[in-house]
Amino acid sequence: MSLMREMLEAGVHFGHQTRYWNPKMAPYIFGHRNKIHIINLEQTVAKYQEASKFVKQLVARGGNILFVGTKRAARELVATEAARCGMPYVDARWLGGMLTNFKTVKSSIKRLKDMEAMVADGGFERMTKKEGLLFQRELDKLNKSIGGIKDMNGLPDALFVIDVGYHKIAVAEAKVLGIPVVAVVDTNHSPDGIDHVIPGNDDSARAIALYAKGMADAVLEGREQNINGLVEEIGEGQEEFVEVQDNQA
C-alpha cells in the first residue's frame, strides 16, 4: 500500500475546524469540507519523507532522538514505538527544564536507577511496611515522569513531537539549546521554529500510530547503517593491519 493511501486511511488529511486555523499553515492546506480544513497530503508525504531521511541520517551518525507524546491518544503509541527502536521518550507530563535543566534531571535519573538496583538486590523486602509503601510510591512517581529517559545520558540530538501546541515548552527548550525538532503540526498551530514540519492530524490514534511507527522505522534503518559503517571501518582497519604484518614478515 502506498504511503499516500495509508495516510488517507488513517485520516492524516483531516485538520481542525476552519475557525481555529493558523494562517501560517496555509501552504499545507488543500481546502475545506464541512467547515474542516483538509491538509494537502502531497505536501505531507514529501515532508514526512524529508523528516524520515533526517532521522535516519542522524541515527546513522550515532545520534539519538527523543520521542515526545504526552496526549492521551499518543502516550502508549509513542512509548511503544520509541521502546521498539531503543530511543528515549516522554509519555507523561513534560517537566519544565527537562532539557534546559538536564543536570537536575540527571540526579533524578540516578535516584531512579539506585532505587531499581535496591529492588534487584532484595532491599525492598527488608523494609518495613510503611518504608516499603513510601519507597514504592516514589519509585512509581519517578518511573512515570522520567522512566522513558532513564537511559538518556546526555541531551538528545533531536526531538520528535506529536502536537506542537500541546508541547510548547518542549519545543521552546529545544529551540533555546539549538536542538532540531521534527514535529506533527495540525492546521490550528504554527509551524514556526519547527525544523522538520509534518503537516497532519495530531488527534487521530491511527494517524499518530503511522507517524510514530514511521519515525521508529527510520531510527532502525539509520542504526543498521551505523552498524554496517562501523563494521566496514573495522574491516578496513584489519586489512591494513594485516598488510603491515605481511610487509614486516
UniProtKB/Swiss-Prot annotation:
- Provide the GO MF annotations for this entry: structural constituent of ribosome
Q: Which domain of life is it from?
A: Bacteria
Key word Electron transport present in the record? no
Enumerate the InterPro entries for this protein.
Ribosomal_uS2 (IPR001865), Ribosomal_uS2_bac/mit/plastid (IPR005706), Ribosomal_uS2_CS (IPR018130), Ribosomal_uS2_flav_dom_sf (IPR023591)
Gene3D superfamilies per the UniProt record, alphabetical: Glucose-6-phosphate isomerase like protein, domain 1 (3.40.50.10490), Helix hairpin bin (1.10.287.610)
Cellular component (GO) terms are: cytosolic small ribosomal subunit
Under the heading NCBIfam families, the entry gives: rpsB_bact
State the name under which the record lists this protein: Small ribosomal subunit protein uS2
